[in-house]
Amino acid sequence: MKKAIIIGSGIGGIATALRLRSMNYDVTVFENNDFPGGKLTSFDLGHYRFDAGPSLLTMPHFIDELFDLFNENPRDHFNYKKKDISCKYFWDDGTKLSAYSDKIKFTKEIENILGVKQSIVSAYLLKAKKKYELTKRMFLEQSLHKLKTYFTKDLLNGVFNIFSFQINKTLNQVNASELKEPHLVQLFNRFATYNGSSPYKTPGMMTLVQHLEQEYGTFVSDKGMQNITNSLYNLALRQGVDFKFNNYVSEILVSNKIATGIKVGDKTYESDIVISNMDVVPTYRNLLKNHYQPEKILNQERSSSALIFYWGVKKEFKNLDLHNIFFSKDYKNEFQTIFENNTISADPTIYINITSKDVKGDAPINCENWFVMINSPNDSGQDWDNMIDQVKSNVIKKINKKLKVNIED
């Protein structure tokens, strides 16, 4: 039986382990922590439970697919429901808008609140869908590292339609041109942040990001996001995947440009396949330090990051939902502050995730668990202690003003 080693038990590592196991590989996952999941974990603060990392669930059928590989019923292990409202949006001028999962309801809401005709928004959404359909096979479902990918019908379709991708314009330019209405432009600009980009820099092709949310909807797990990790980890155990926790991988072993195993402490483990689920920069800098370094890739501009507060709130807010966005007044300035000044705007856009809206055990009765996230620059030596104190103060003031409360009471 061929052997496969996975470095890191994040959700990508677990999913990869399952797919290789379904192909009859003997799979071992090495993890530095003493728990699986990587960023997709949770923790408790008193009587409140919080998802520590990713908070948005789309396309859960890909999770179901992993159970299907082993003829197991996903509903026996992982359950979720579709949200009627994907996100609630709030602006400084008092404008409020609910982004419904149903496209007709969503476009009607936009027309009623912002005065933009349904036909305009529908045309915009259709363009985004076409971009996704033209690129998904090549970029999402095939490996760009395989030569055969470049000799497929999918690639030819992409080449022939390259001008429809709007790569010569920024996302903001596309949105401003096609949607015009400032609130709506800001709403669709925010999807650049899903991969840590600025809508004023990222190409117009990125309109396809929002398509996943609008086309497939937003979902919530009945036990929170960590149940994705727990259910797939337990599936992997049932299928014979071996997990080695508290094992720090110090090196990927390479022979003739082929990965042949790993080194953990003074031990070596040989394998037919080695897959790193770590981020690309630490993989090269730490695990492949004595080998070729693709400097052009490794020195690319870093994405934005996030500053997250976890607050137990002794009150329920009926006007909020699972996902909520409070926009900054000057979006362009916010991104300039992040990417050019390497700091956080005094008026940041605030994302509040409240899983207790749907998972009642996540907070005490009449209380809520708030996951409060702010876009921030990457870590480049800033005085984070001072910055965090100031941001927290600004965020609380903004929330209190918008919701007409004092959340610290």
Model segments located where?
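N-terminal glycine-rich phosphate/pyrophosphate-binding loop and immediately adjacent elements
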Residues: 2-136
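Rossmann-like flavin
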Residues: 92-202
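Conserved flavin/dinucleotide-binding core of flavoenzymes
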Residues: 322-323, 334-409
